[in-house]
Every structure is written in C-alpha cells, then in structure tokens.
Regions:
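N-terminal nucleophile
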Residues: 1-242
C-alpha cells in the first residue's frame, strides 16, 4: 500500500508520497510514485496509489505520448480538467489488459494530479481507478489516496482555504510521519514536491529520508510538542496528585 497527499494552498501546491511497496512481509521494495512534468507554460505533478503495475504503465504511457508529440498528452491538454480526463482514460486502458478477468482481479490505481497552466488557476484533482475524477472541497483544499486514515486528522485540523504553502508543506510532512508511525505498509523515502503559484516550474523536489534535517526538524518538534502539551493537561479529580 502507499500514502499520498496533495494540498492546494493560497500560493502554491504541495505533494508528498511514500515509496514503499509490499507484497507480503518478506517482499518489500522501494519505488517512486511521483511523476513531474515541468515544461514551458505548465507544471504538472502526479502521485499514485494502488496496483504498481498499472501505475507504472500509466506513467510509461504518459512518457510515450510526450515523446510522440501527437494526439493527447500533457502538453496538448488545454486545462487540468482535460489532464485529469486523459489520466483517467490511461488508467482504464492499463488496468484491464487483454486476458485478465477484471471480475476477479483488481488492477486499478488512483492518482492525484495538480499544478498550474499559464493564465489559469492552481488545480488539484483525484482520478479514481474507474477513470472519473473530482476536485477537493473549497473548505478543505486537500486530497489523499492510499492509507489515508492515519494522516488525515492533522489535515482536517490545519488545512483551510487560507493556508500558506509553507504551513501546507509542514502539515504534509507531519501527515506522512503520522502514517509512517502507524502503518508498516507505508515507508520512506518520501518524495516531496512544492510548486509556487505563477512560477511554472517546481520550486522544490526532494527525496527525503526520516533522518534528513528538513524532515526530522518538523516531525521531531511536532512529536515533542505533543508530549509537552499532553503532560500539561488538567488532572481528573480522582487521580492521585501526590
């Protein structure tokens, strides 16, 4: 399994995805689940969760379409709605190869895609395995896929329409760290990408281990703060106050 988060802030977009893939306790591998297209008038970031074979096939199809420079590709799509539709069609095509009984075998993947095309607003979409897609709620401008239950609470508390890209970045790392601590199927290194509004190039793209300073400073301080606040809570009247 995996965990991916995308956050649309006022001044940019943040993506984070883990890179652990498991096929049983004795078969754990590392694969990047992030795809970045940063050319000309647009920046597009994609992360994926689900069947690894399908996800890699979709990414390969995107690369091949860009090389052929004909038909539909990330450069010819007029807006992110078309990009989401394009990824959805590739997802359907690659999740049901010939000879596979789709009634008994689940080969679907889901994708988060976001960024900006020049002259258009920041966009963020979730593309489902069935090919359809959604945008985040205006009141909660983030989307998550994969093992979402551990990293979602901090997002619900912190991420608002007014959130800055810096706070969104810190929240994304804390959300990822919360998931790593509770789910063994999610693991480092963490692919982390930041896009700033109207720049049309990636501001930062890194592969972070939990010992890297940029990651550990935020997550260690968060953990320490939780312990300090918890220890300061008022005591119940039935507790021994000695």
């Amino acid at each position: 399994m995996t965990y991916c988060v995308g956050i649309k802030a006022q001044d940019g977009i943040v993506f984070a995805s883990d890179s652990r893939t498991t096929a049983g306790l004795d078969n754990v591998n590392i694969y990047s689940k992030m795809f970045v297209h940063d050319v000309g008038d647009r920046s597009v970031i994609i992360v994926t969760s689900g069947n690894l074979g399908t996800s890699q096939a979709v990414y390969k199809s995107i690369e091949n379409d860009l090389k052929s420079d004909s038909g539909t590709n990330l450069n010819t799509c007029k807006d992110f709605d078309q990009i989401a539709s394009y990824i959805g069609s590739l997802n359907i095509k690659n999740s049901a190869p010939k000879g596979i009984n789709t009634d008994t075998v689940l080969l679907g993947s889901s994708f988060l895609v976001g960024g900006q095309i020049k002259g258009q607003p920041l966009e963020l979409y979730l593309v489902y395995s069935q090919g359809n897609y959604i945008k985040p709620a205006v009141s909660k401008p983030y989307l998550v896929i994969g093992e979402v239950k551990y990293g979602k609470p901090i997002l619900d508390r912190v991420i608002k329409p007014s959130v800055s890209i810096g706070d969104a970045s810190r929240c994304a790392l804390i959300s990822m760290d919360s998931t790593l601590k509770s789910d063994l199927t999610v693991g480092p290194p963490i692919d982390f990408a930041v896009y700033k509004k109207d720049e049309y190039k990636i501001a930062s793209q890194k592969c972070l281990n939990i010992t890297d300073t940029e990651y550990s400073k935020v997550c260690d301080q968060w953990s320490d703060s939780i312990f300090k606040i918890f220890d300061s809570f008022p005591r119940f009247d039935w507790e021994d106050n000695k």
